[in-house]
């Protein structure tokens, strides 16, 4: 990135997206994750939540399912792996290293990107990944809340950061297929 590219509005817009993705997820988790768990710090809050731990500012306790609609439930699940619970048997530090390397690679890609769509997609991915990484560092797992299902079909349980990451990937795929790029005139 050079000084000329700093004048590009997509740089500031994408930074705003990253901050929003991170901030909205942190705010949601601050409202829902117990103050007792936060006070524990690096202790494995995953184990704490298997017993009774009241949530800050609500009567809701993790683990119980709150049916919102016929296809949407609200529940706290601690994901000790990465997406879809993959690699949940690996130690937290190794997942932290993988996450840090991924975030660094995305940041380098963001700096070198010349497309607004790529910058926005990467920013959403980085903001969401940073928030989930902070969960892993603080609690030993990532707090997930939203569960979509229909009949016997069940989607994985996710959080606001996961929504940001998914939206970021969709923007990257849109750029890959050419959306948002100026069309070349036929010769």
Stretch-by-stretch model annotation:
Residues 1-187:
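Alpha-helical transmembrane bundles and membrane-interface segments of multipass inner-membrane proteins
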């Amino acid at each position: 990135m050079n000084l000329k590219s700093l004048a590009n509005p997509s740089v500031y817009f994408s930074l705003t997206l990253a901050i929003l993705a991170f901030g909205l997820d942190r705010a949601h988790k601050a409202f829902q994750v117990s103050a007792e768990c936060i006070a524990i710090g690096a202790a494995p809050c995953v184990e704490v939540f298997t017993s009774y731990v009241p949530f800050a500012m609500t009567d809701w306790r993790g683990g119980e399912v709150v049916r919102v609609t016929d296809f949407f439930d609200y529940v706290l699940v601690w994901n000790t792996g990465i997406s879809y619970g993959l690699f949940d048997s690996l130690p937290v530090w190794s997942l932290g290293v993988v996450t840090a390397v991924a975030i660094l690679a995305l940041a380098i890609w963001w700096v070198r990107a010349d497309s607004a769509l790529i910058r926005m997609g990467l920013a959403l991915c980085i903001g969401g990944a940073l928030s989930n990484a902070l969960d892993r560092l603080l609690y030993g797992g990532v707090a997930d809340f939203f569960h979509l299902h229909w009949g016997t079909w069940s989607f994985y349980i996710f959080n606001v950061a996961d929504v940001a990451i998914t939206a970021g990937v969709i923007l990257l795929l849109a750029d890959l297929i050419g959306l948002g790029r100026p069309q070349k005139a036929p010769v």
